[in-house]
Amino acid sequence: MSVHIEAKQGEIAESILLPGDPLRAKYIAETFLEDVTCYNNVRGMLGFTGTYKGKRVSVQGTGMGVPSISIYVNELIQSYGVKNLIRVGTCGAIQKDVKVRDVIIAMTACTDSNINRLTFPGFDFAPAANFDLLKKAYDAGTEKGLHIRVGNVLTADVFYRESMDMVKKLGDYGVLAVEMETTALYTLAAKYGVNALSVLTVSDHIFTGEETTAEERQTTFNEMIEIALEAAIQQ
C-alpha cells in the first residue's frame, strides 16, 4: 500500500492508463477490459486492473491538475513499479487548424506551473514523451483513419483565466492545445526512468468556442482509449 493507493503488490500492471476522472477509469475498465478487479477506492479515486487482448493493463484516476497527478504517478512508480504510463483525457484547442474531435499526442509540454522550478531553480526543464509509446499510439490512430496531431501542449495551472493573451502567444509559437497534467507526468517519468505519454481528445476550441456534443465526445473518447490501449500492450 501507498498513502493514496490501497493496492497490494502485484495488483497493478506495469502498463497503466491515467484518466483524470475516476468515473472515466471505471468506464474504461468496464467497457474495454476483461477479468476486471478494483484495487483502489481511497478518496474515491478508483483504480482497476484487467486484460486487453490477453495482456494485463491497469487504469487509475488521477484527479485534475499538476499536484494531483503528481501524487498518483509518484506512488504508482515508486510503490508499484509501473513502467508505462499513458494519460488519456481532454484538451482545448489553441491552433486554428486543430478541430474538435481531433486526437492530439503530446510530444512535449510547456507550462505556467512552477513545479519544475522547485527542482531546477532558474532553469526551464523541457519534459518529453517516450518516443516508442508515441510512435505506437500514432500508428494505431492512423490505422483507424483518425486525424492525429503531434506536438507541444500547454499544461496550465489555471482553468478559469482572466486573460488569454499568453495562450494566444503560445499559439503563435505552435502550441496545439491546453490541458492540466502532462508536464508533471513527463517530468516524473524522466526522473524515474520510465515511459510516459499523453493522448488527448479535443473537446472544445479555446478561441472559436466550438464544442463537441456529449455523444461526439464519447465516440472520440472511445477511439482515444483504443489508441492508448494498443500502445500500452505493445510496450
Swiss-Prot record:
Catalyzes the reversible phosphorolytic breakdown of the N-glycosidic bond in the beta-(deoxy)ribonucleoside molecules, with the formation of the corresponding free purine bases and pentose-1-phosphate. The keyword Transferase applies. Keywords: Glycosyltransferase, Transferase. Disulfide bonds: none annotated. PANTHER family: FI09636P-RELATED, URIDINE PHOSPHORYLASE. A purine D-ribonucleoside binds at residues 4, 162, 179-181, 203-204. It comes from Bacillus cytotoxicus (strain DSM 22905 / CIP 110041 / 391-98 / NVH 391-98). This is Purine nucleoside phosphorylase DeoD-type. Coiled coil: none annotated. GO terms for molecular function: purine-nucleoside phosphorylase activity. HAMAP family: Pur_nucleosid_phosp. It catalyses: a purine D-ribonucleoside + phosphate = a purine nucleobase + alpha-D-ribose 1-phosphate; a purine 2'-deoxy-D-ribonucleoside + phosphate = a purine nucleobase + 2-deoxy-alpha-D-ribose 1-phosphate. The active site is at residue 204. The gene is deoD. GO terms for cellular component: cytosol.
